[in-house]
A protein has these predicted regions:
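N-terminal active-site wall of soluble small-molecule enzyme domains
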Residues: 64-75, 83-98
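Hydrophobic faces of well-ordered beta-strands that scaffold small-molecule active sites
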Residues: 76-79, 104-108
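An N-cap/entry alpha-helix motif that binds or orients negatively charged groups
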Residues: 1-72
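Conserved, mostly hydrophobic/aromatic
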Residues: 21, 78, 99
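Glycine- and other small-residue-rich loops at beta-strand/loop junctions that grip anionic moieties
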Residues: 30, 84, 108-109
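Glycine-rich loops and low-complexity Gly/Arg-rich segments
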Residues: 52-53, 101-105
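A short, structure-level motif marking secondary-structure boundaries and short turns
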Residues: 26, 79-81
């Protein structure tokens, strides 16, 4: 599987599982303690249906939004994660650069 073959969350997860050493994949893919919060957050998406607007032009799609008065090009928040250098040599700097490149937010842990 290649990046160009990824079309949804499950595809990206499969690719990561193939490419990363097992301990690093499980560190990223895992959750804290007994993973109850992870399971609840994940299962909450089972109750959400995305209903497409069929026959609507998609030549110009705008994902931008405004959060706290700042316009963002993407509605994503890149959260801090410990040990990011395990999966990229530049660690948090790489995530910060990506947030800047795509004009979205990146959190810093204290």
């Amino acid at each position: 599987m290649r990046l160009k073959d990824c079309h949804n969350f499950s595809d990206f997860r499969k690719l990561a599982k193939q490419k990363l050493p097992s301990p690093i994949f499980h560190y990223i893919d895992g959750a804290a303690d007994d993973e109850i919060t992870y399971a609840r957050n994940t299962s909450a998406f089972d109750d959400v249906d995305l209903v497409p607007n069929v026959l609507r032009g998609v030549e110009s799609v705008d994902l931008s939004t405004t959060i706290f008065g700042k316009k963002l090009d993407l509605p994503f928040y890149l959260a801090p994660t410990a040990l990011q250098r395990l999966f990229h040599y530049d660690g948090e700097r790489a995530v910060g650069k990506a947030a800047q490149k795509y004009n979205t937010m990146f959190g810093v842990s204290a």
